Amino acid sequence: MAASMARGVSARVLLRAAGGSWGPRAGHAAVTSRTFGTTGERRAGEEAADSPELPRDVVNVVFVDRSGKRIPVRGKVGDNVLYLAQRHGVDLEGACEASLACSTCHVYVSEAHLDLLPPPEEREDDMLDMAPLLQENSRLGCQIVLTPELEGVEFALPKITRNFYVDGHIPKPH
């Protein structure tokens, strides 16, 4: 029976083949169907997108896009910078979805805040080595988690990235 179920044969067909039915039999309870619920989609490392509830949880961040436009956003303590940018329409790709397998979320961290971040781990450094236009203040947005000390931080996007999407395509979170 398990092999049949694995091949996609429904329980109803199996019950009928065995002489059973979905209706109640004398001395037996009726078979009821079950419904399944799902939780909202969330990628690894992504925090809930709701606004910070307490002022102490707010971290004001400014993204500077490739054209130089400043985009101020309100993040919250614990937010991942890549997902924060994507929620606010900032063109930060994140092709590998924060799995440290690309460098498309490469950002420049404001000098005043760079030393407030923990040093990059070896895997992040390895990915940054593949990023074009690397600078001393380069980091991967997927590896930066907001803390209260990062209040007022600026993340500038480099003029180019080694992207994995077709020109003109606007990246969207998966």
From Swiss-Prot:
Localization terms from the record: Mitochondrion; Mitochondrion matrix
Family matches, as Gene3D superfamilies: 3.10.20.30
GO biological process: [2Fe-2S] cluster assembly; [4Fe-4S] cluster assembly; iron-sulfur cluster assembly; P450-containing electron transport chain; ubiquinone biosynthetic process
Swiss-Prot/TrEMBL keywords: 2Fe-2S, Electron transport, Iron, Iron-sulfur, Metal-binding, Mitochondrion, Transit peptide, Transport
MF GO annotations: 2 iron, 2 sulfur cluster binding; electron transfer activity; metal ion binding
GO cellular component: a single term: iron-sulfur cluster assembly complex
Protein role: Electron donor, of the core iron-sulfur cluster (ISC) assembly complex, that acts to reduce the persulfide into sulfide during [2Fe-2S] clusters assembly on the scaffolding protein ISCU. The core iron-sulfur cluster (ISC) assembly complex is involved in the de novo synthesis of a [2Fe-2S] cluster, the first step of the mitochondrial iron-sulfur protein biogenesis. This process is initiated by the cysteine desulfurase complex (NFS1:LYRM4:NDUFAB1) that produces persulfide which is delivered on the scaffold protein ISCU in a FXN-dependent manner.
Subunit structure: Component of the mitochondrial core iron-sulfur cluster (ISC) complex composed of NFS1, LYRM4, NDUFAB1, ISCU, FXN, and FDX2; this complex is a heterohexamer containing two copies of each monomer. Form a heterodimer complex with NFS1. Interacts (in both their reduced and oxidized states) with the cysteine desulfurase (NFS1:LYRM4) complex; this interaction stimulates cysteine desulfurase activity, and serves as a reductant for Fe-S cluster assembly.
Name of protein: Ferredoxin-2, mitochondrial
Gene field: Fdx2
